[in-house]
């Protein structure tokens, strides 16, 4: 296509330009950020699992199962993103990594990573409610859908069909396809899982804390310039 893949010119966001031209290399900054962000998510999920019996705050006992269903769903989501892009990746589920652990873990076959992803999603399916408590939260059906996609990527077509077919009747396409690009079309009848983005200026910046700003970056980079 004739549009730029990001930034204001062909010399802006060089990492994305190289990916767009299929000339990227292993030190591409955009690919490094995905690796970093996904493993930050894995680390946080592992922290939650590690301290499962130590948390105590109002309402925790009531929502504990749902909360840990979300933890398992998100860890599966992060590892799935990693294995889709990088193939064999370092795998750890017990404890957290520190800066001193950098470079100490070896990659494992992606089949082992997929096994952990499937296990986490089964745990999420068993723990998550069928109806989301608020927009942006995963449900048991969200976990079902992601597991079906995981099966497809492994060419487990029969397993994928079995788990995805019951979901078909639960979601419908909007009568106006263009509505999905509008605010009023967010979290609509076709939405299985939807990350909640924000356009507020107090959340985004261009350097010192990028991992907390993905939602705003998504709005800025995918919307019409000047529309947010």
What positions do the PLM features span?
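Short clusters of hydrophobic/aromatic residues that line enzyme substrate/ligand-binding pockets
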Residues: 19-24, 91, 128, 173, ...
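Short, well-structured active-site flanking segments
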Residues: 83-95, 157-164
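Short coil/linker segments at helix-helix boundaries
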Residues: 88-111, 115
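Short, hydrophobic secondary-structure boundary micro-motifs
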Residues: 57-58, 91-95, 174-176
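Generic secondary-structure boundary/loop-capping signal
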Residues: 32, 83-89, 102, 178, ...
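An aromatic- and glycine-enriched ligand-binding surface/loop that stacks and positions planar moieties
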Residues: 1-12, 114, 118, 122-125, ...
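Conserved, well-structured interaction surfaces
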Residues: 9-86, 108-112, 121-135
